[in-house]
Amino acid sequence: MAIELGLFAKTALASRFTDWAKQYGPVFPLRIGSHGLMVVLTSAYHATHLLDKRSANSSNRPPSFVLGDLVFAGDHPMFMDANERWKLRRKLYFQLMNEARCNTEHIRLVEAEATHLLRDLCLEPDSFMQHPARYSNSIIMSLVFGIRTPHYSSPHCIELQRIVTELSNLGEIGASPPVDWLPFLKYLPERLWGDWKTRAARLRQRVLNLHSPLVDRVLERRKNIGTAATFLDGVLDRQEKLQLTREEIDIMCGNLLEGGTDTMATTILTFFQAMVTYPEVQARAQKQIDSVLTDGECPSWSDYDRLPYVAMIVKEVLRWRPPAPGSFPHTLAQDDEFEGMKFLKGTSVVLNVWGIHNDESRYPSPETFEPSRFAEQTRLASVYANAGDAQKRDHFGYGAGRRICPGIHLAERALFIAMAKLLWGFTVQQKLDSSGNPIPVDVNPATAYRDGFLNQCLPFDIDIKPRLGRQEMIMVAAAKAENDVLSAYE
């Protein structure tokens, strides 16, 4: 028997899945309408066995008429089945963001952009909600196009964030008719469902209007100056073999921007929320940093092993408020069976990240932000994801199986470097009202985040100030980063 999910359901699905898992168990079927069948996994054990160890059979995607077809015309890797087209894009992404390249080529850029983030916060502390998006976007933009994002007001950065929000909203169940399960709904007047086709068409045009001019800039630079060590240059250098259409190239580059900008920015904002709400965690991390580094020394990637508590904080942020709490469904390519449970070909499998991360048997007092729960798991998330051991897995913030985030190595480094430098350079506290009373920051998962596929922070306010003597050091380091590294990018 399958639980019936109403065709109009939309709100807080990951939370509802978690409640149902407590009632029906860690693996339960979910029927959407009269045809669509899902299986929801709220168990690290089952996720590891069905998505990691059987990834050859569980890496397809369900139909996605609205986003996959109308918005991206079948060219977006996120909505592709695990076919040859998807494998090519996956291969190209891993070639850009594999661990070796992150350690040897990309780390200087990440360090420099993180230093620029500190500078931004010194100069414009009240814009703290915008600076993380600039940081993450500039890293991805530089790697893909060789073009930086110097300020959060850069037009491409603003428009990308708006597009990602609209994608998240439009992709949520209930935002458009369930045409993937009831195809006849495609032919009903769209005004009956919020002009969903028009919204999708407009969003598609906005996507192309954002990405295509960036590709044009690279083509112009190659013609006038020459090639550069970017993702797009590498693709164009092999275009005779790859034979990609111009639209495929635009969407493929755009996918990297969409996937890397908002999730990383939201994670850093969640870090701010946690540090304000749990000041003892912030104080402990700062004490460790101060005890390890000499005066005038700012944390860097080379300090990862010396700052285990910061590594724990990164993991706990991703566990406490995962940027994608429900994950995008996988689909089975063939019938499967596991421990007496039968799964039919075409069944969608949802990894309920929120539910796993709030499993009290796995994470005691899961609602509490407690980095020390990872005291025995301070290695990088990719190590535990590749181990295939559910008990040793730290978290599922990057997904599972062959659909795990291809930018996991870059994200792990960018998040650690940013959080370590922020803890070294600043103290974040609650704002005070006109009477001098602290203003609490809302961290309630039901009210502090925008409802949608992605867990985006709603506006909040904090007081962020440089620690004693750090502002001058930050400005000197930022000038050096600009001269030595960032000036090489447009």
Curated annotation (Swiss-Prot):
| Annotated binding of heme, by residue | C405
* Mutant phenotype after disruption: Abolishes the production of (2R)-annullatin F, (2S,9S)-annullatin D, (2R)-annullatin G and (2S,9S)-annullatin H, and leads to the accumulation of (14S)-annullatin I, 2-hydroxymethyl-3-pentylphenol, (2S)-annullatin B and (2S)-annullatin A.
**What pathway does the annotation place this protein in?**
Secondary metabolite biosynthesis
Q: Which residues form a coiled coil?
A: none
Query: Which EC numbers does the record give?
Result: 1.-.-.-
Tell me the keywords, alphabetical order: Heme, Iron, Metal-binding, Monooxygenase, Oxidoreductase
State the reactions this protein catalyses: 2-hydroxymethyl-3-pentylphenol + reduced [NADPH--hemoprotein reductase] + O2 = (8S)-annullatin E + oxidized [NADPH--hemoprotein reductase] + H2O + H(+)
Necessary cofactors: heme
Pfam families the record matches: p450
Biological processes, Gene Ontology terms: mycotoxin biosynthetic process
Tell me which InterPro entries the record gives.
Answer: Cyt_P450, Cyt_P450_E_grp-I, Cyt_P450_sf, Cytochrome_P450_fung
* Disulphide bridges, residue numbers: none
Question: From the Swiss-Prot or TrEMBL record, what is one GO molecular function term?
Answer: iron ion binding
Q: Which family does it belong to?
A: Belongs to the cytochrome P450 family.
- Function of the protein: Cytochrome P450 monooxygenase; part of the gene cluster that mediates the biosynthesis of annullatin D, an alkylated aromatic polyketide with a fused dihydrobenzofuran lactone ring system that exhibits potent agonistic activities toward the cannabinoid receptors. Within the pathway, anuE catalyzes the hydroxylation of 2-hydroxymethyl-3-pentylphenol at the side chain to produce (8S)-annullatin E.
UniProt-recorded name of the protein: Cytochrome P450 monooxygenase anuE
Organism, by scientific name, is: Penicillium roqueforti (strain FM164)
- The primary gene name is anuE
